[in-house]
């Protein structure tokens, strides 16, 4: 054993070092077997360029023909033809200025130009047009992957087209025939960057696995109608899956992708995506349609062969520099859609689908936005009580430099309706004039602000809601007027650091006083308001709640201190911030929730954030919040990440949310997993482990529930012309109320991808990491 130890140690060291280089760059590896054109390019009209012929022996019948034998080299411009024997024929046609010059070559014929190399036993070439034929030969593209053979190879239109009779095409390097496409006719169009194949047979090795009377393969990044690279995978949930996307280049500003997605256990899904570019902006529309899902039986288990669908519309644009249009609309057929079916337009962790339309106008000192907002919540209770704002009008008017003051007026009008007819509905009108006195210089600033918050509610309260004693007692008409006063000051001190040449440290104390009087708001229902997360920057917010339904009283001072360190290139290397809110009187709105029912005053809320970029590869980031009203640490997170490059990364993280904070932020939570709080520790990593092999993994463990929250491991092998990855994922998808246990979904999947048809040669680690229920997010 002792004798073997040095060998084992050397092997481990070699593997670690080799994985760091992985032949340095897979793209460079894949170009090792690709020919390049390394001669100086000749410019000018090819037909006007001279023809140069070298040979061991020449027999000429001037000017009609000549026979060259022995190491024959024919050159014209950037084209070169070599052979054992070449016959040059020249025919002067009546009315033609330039004679027709052709060559017939036999014996070890080779043709090359900046785009392609041809090789065969016999060939013919028109020196005027560069049309070239090679019998029973082989070809290889120059400067990019792509090769094959054919009974007859033709070059046409100055080598734009390569036409093969009974030919093959593959992106694999010479000596590797892992896959190929065979056709009775194959046409490669270099300008359009596409290969068209008739009577196509797709082969893995020597075994044909797929037939199509016609097929297109893209061999570049140019937009072109045709079939894209197929994809196959297997999951325990869906069985064998096969996707064959078709790209439709409709017009310069329109295109679409139509993808039949076969799932062995569920059926055939059609994934359709349409993209456009118009004067009002650009956008994407998508419709995924699964007409008869053989597994899904609906929320109540009685809907057999249910039709499942997804519709998405995303749009963003500016027109005439003043009009702004935005759409973010996603709707699915059922709450379990993202749990069962994979989509780039949502995931189970979102919890809801957003449906927002906005149209806005912006001028020099005012803007207006008209919007429609609705949410499809994926929990039964949430979806049955969701509210929509249809319509909502927001307006802003700005007037700066009115003497020493800046003015701002914000107004809103919104109509709230509920998907549940037994819930209250309301019209809300709000106006918020603000006057600021900003003062600043090179080392500090102070801003004094006064505003008036005036809101009117006209509520429609159903009788069934009003008669329920457990519901709040609402009023049909409510007026709420609240003044607000704020003073916010900050000073920045900086100094050069003695122990680090060129480094600068700053010290930035900040203090803010905020006053808002108390107003009991129990007579107003909650339509669009939730408790906001309180991190360090949140200490200096005006509001405790989002929306306008709850405006908490305030008589408080927020203080904070931030220190930053910049290197000699002014890159921030370190910062730390800590702050607190001191309450002179308790903050309240009138309701009886835990966070609002405390009589405590003094320093109640503390928050801190820190970030440390140790070097360009290693960094730390974290934050914590403490609320004495809840008597606990409310939120916390910490991340340490080492990222060497796009494929080499290790991240450790921890996140925490106290049960009291969750109950205060989301009062109606019945899942025991959340009622006891969140305390999750996890790690995410990706690393090449050997030549062309890469592994990724993610593991999150809930220390409160004492169970894994998510597990992911993936292994990918990459070559120059194909890649395969195998992955396993286990994730929580719901709560089993009957068994009082978490529901898990186990997924085993594999994907096969053809490589070399475009410029990408990544190891695929990013795609694998983003496929998990908790996608990787960079820490810095």
UniProtKB/Swiss-Prot annotation:
Top-rank taxon: Bacteria
One GO BP annotation of this record: Gram-negative-bacterium-type cell outer membrane assembly
GO CC term, one of those recorded: cell outer membrane
Location(s) in or outside the cell: Cell outer membrane
A matching Pfam family: LptD
Keywords (A to Z) from UniProt: Cell outer membrane, Membrane, Signal
Signal peptide region: 1-24
Sequence similarity: Belongs to the LptD family.
UniProt xrefs under HAMAP family: LPS_assembly_LptD (MF_01411)
Quaternary structure note: Component of the lipopolysaccharide transport and assembly complex. Interacts with LptE and LptA.
Function: Together with LptE, is involved in the assembly of lipopolysaccharide (LPS) at the surface of the outer membrane.
Stated name of the protein: LPS-assembly protein LptD
């Amino acid at each position: 054993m002792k004798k073997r130890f040095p060998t084992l140690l050397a092997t481990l060291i070699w593997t670690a070092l080799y994985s760091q280089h992985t032949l340095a760059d897979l793209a460079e590896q894949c170009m090792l077997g690709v020919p390049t054109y390394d001669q100086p390019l000749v410019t000018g009209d090819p037909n006007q360029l001279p023809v140069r012929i070298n040979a061991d022996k020449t027999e000429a019948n001037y000017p009609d023909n000549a026979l060259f034998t022995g190491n024959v080299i024919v050159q014209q411009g950037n084209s070169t033809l070599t052979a054992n024997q070449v016959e040059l024929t020249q025919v002067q046609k009546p009315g033609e200025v330039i004679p027709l010059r052709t060559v017939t070559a036999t014996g070890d014929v080779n043709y090359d130009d900046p785009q392609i190399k041809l090789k065969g036993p016999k060939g013919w070439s028109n020196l005027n047009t560069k049309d070239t034929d090679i019998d029973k030969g082989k070809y290889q593209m120059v400067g990019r992957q792509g090769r094959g053979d054919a009974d007859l190879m033709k070059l046409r239109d100055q080598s734009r087209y390569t036409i093969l009779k009974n030919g093959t095409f593959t992106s694999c390097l010479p000596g590797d025939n892992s896959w190929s496409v065979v056709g009775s006719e194959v046409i490669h169009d270099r300008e359009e960057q596409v290969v068209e194949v008739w009577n196509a047979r797709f082969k893995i090795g020597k075994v044909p696995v797929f037939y199509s009377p016609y097929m297109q393969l893209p061999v570049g990044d140019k937009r072109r109608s045709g079939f894209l690279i197929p994809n196959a995978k297997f999951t325990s949930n869906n069985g064998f899956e096969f996707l064959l996307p078709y790209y439709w280049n409709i017009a310069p500003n329109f295109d679409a992708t139509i993808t039949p997605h076969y799932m062995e256990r569920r059926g055939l899904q059609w994934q359709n995506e349409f993209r456009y570019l118009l004067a009002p902006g650009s956008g994407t529309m998508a419709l995924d349609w699964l007409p008869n899902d053989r597994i899904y039986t609906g929320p109540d288990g009685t809907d057999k062969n249910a039709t499942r669908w997804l519709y998405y519309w995303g749009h963003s644009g500016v027109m005439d520099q003043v009009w702004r249009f935005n759409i973010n609309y996603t709707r699915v057929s059922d709450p379990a859609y993202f749990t069962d079916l994979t989509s780039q337009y949502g995931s189970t962790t979102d919890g809801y689908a957003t449906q927002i339309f906005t149209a806005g106008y912006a001028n020099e000192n005012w803007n207006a936005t008209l919007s429609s907002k609705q949410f499809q919540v994926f929990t039964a209770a949430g979806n049955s009580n969701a509210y929509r704002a249809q319509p909502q009008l927001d307006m802003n008017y700005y007037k700066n430099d009115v003497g020493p003051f800046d003015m701002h007026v914000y107004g809103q009008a919104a109509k709230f309706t509920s998907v549940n007819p037994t819930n209250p509905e309301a019209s809300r009108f709000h106006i918020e004039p603000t006057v600021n006195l900003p003062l600043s210089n090179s080392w500090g600033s102070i801003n004094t602000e006064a505003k008036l918050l005036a809101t009117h509610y006209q509520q429609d309260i159903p009788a069934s809601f009003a008669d329920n004693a457990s519901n709040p007692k609402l009023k049909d008409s409510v007026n709420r007027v609240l003044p607000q006063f704020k003073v916010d000051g900050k000073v920045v001190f900086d100094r050069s650091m003695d122990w680090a040449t060129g480094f600068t440290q700053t010290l930035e104390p900040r203090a803010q006083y905020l006053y808002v009087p108390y107003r009991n708001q129990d007579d107003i229902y909650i339509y669009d308001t939730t408790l906001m997360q309180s991190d360090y920057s949140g200490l200096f917010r005006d509001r405790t709640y989002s929306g306008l339904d709850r405006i908490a009283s305030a008589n408080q001072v927020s203080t904070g201190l931030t220190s930053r360190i910049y290197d000699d290139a002014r890159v921030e290397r370190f910062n730390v911030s800590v702050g607190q809110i001191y309450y002179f009187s308790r903050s309240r709105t009138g309701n009886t929730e835990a966070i609002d029912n405390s009589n405590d005053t003094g320093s109640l809320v503390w928050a801190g954030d820190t970030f440390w970029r140790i070097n360009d590869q290693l960094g730390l980031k974290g934050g914590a919040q403490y609320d004495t009203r809840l008597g606990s640490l409310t939120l916390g997170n910490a991340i340490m990440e080492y990222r060497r490059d796009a494929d080499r990364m290790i991240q450790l993280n921890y996140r925490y949310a106290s049960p009291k904070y969750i109950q205060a932020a989301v009062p109606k939570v019945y899942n025991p997993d959340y009622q006891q709080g969140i305390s999750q520790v996890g790690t995410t990593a990706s690393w090449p482990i050997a030549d062309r092999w890469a592994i990724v993994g993610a593991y999150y463990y809930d220390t409160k529930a004492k169970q894994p929250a998510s597990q992911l491991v993936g292994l990918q092998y990459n070559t120059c012309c194909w890649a395969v990855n195998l992955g396993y994922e286990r994730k929580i998808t719901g709560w089993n109320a009957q068994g009082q246990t978490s529901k898990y979904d186990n997924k085993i999947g594999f994907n096969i991808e053809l490589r070399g048809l475009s410029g990408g040669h990544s190891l695929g680690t990013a795609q694998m990491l983003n496929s998990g229920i908790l996608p990787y997010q960079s820490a810095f």
